[in-house]
């Protein structure tokens, strides 16, 4: 079976008490909680495309780690059948949230602890990836102040 490739971002921020939060968005069709993700952009580095997908889908800006933190696979259901997709994931340190963004009217966004995010996502490998981040992402790397809104 052919495996399609996507790129995605795990948007993180650190609260004043050191708690790490991840921003999830809802999918457009099923309204399940997911990370911002999309198809690679021809001629654009994957980490840059992941940053742009996060801006378009979640209305966030920040600093992205250029090395992927992992992958997960999921089954994408389309009108012409299902497709197996492998998502390469990049960590995005959120520095700001936009009040208006391209997919604002199509998705919800919400902050979760990493453990809660792992509970609400449905893709098993994404659950594992989020569980793996608990305690492994050094708070010194997330030294930015949390965004003013949301």
Name each model-derived stretch.
Residues 1-4, 12-14, 71, 75, ...:
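Class I (Rossmann-like) S-adenosyl-L-methionine-dependent methyltransferase catalytic domain
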Residues 1-36:
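N-terminal strand-loop-strand
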Residues 4, 8-14, 64-69, 88-91:
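Sequence/structural signature of beta-propeller domains
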Residues 16-18, 29-32, 41, 48, ...:
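Short, charged/polar surface micro-motifs in flexible loops or helix N-caps
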Residues 71-100, 110:
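Active-site-adjacent beta-strand/loop module that shapes the phosphate/pyrophosphate-binding cleft
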């Amino acid at each position: 079976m052919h495996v399609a490739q996507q790129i995605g971002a795990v948007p993180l921020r650190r609260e004043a008490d050191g708690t790490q939060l991840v921003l999830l968005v809802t999918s457009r069709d099923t309204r399940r909680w997911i990370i911002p993700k999309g198809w690679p952009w021809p001629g654009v580095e994957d980490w840059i495309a992941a940053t742009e997908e996060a801006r378009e889908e979640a209305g966030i800006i920040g600093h992205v780690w250029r090395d992927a933190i992992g992958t997960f696979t999921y089954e994408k259901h389309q009108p012409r059948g299902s497709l197996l997709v492998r998502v390469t994931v990049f960590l995005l340190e959120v520095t700001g949230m936009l009040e208006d963004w391209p997919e604002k009217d199509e998705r919800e966004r919400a902050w979760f602890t990493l453990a809660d995010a792992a509970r609400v996502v449905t893709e098993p490998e994404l659950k594992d990836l989020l569980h793996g981040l608990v305690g492994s992402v050094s708070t010194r790397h997330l030294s930015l102040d949390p965004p003013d809104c949301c």
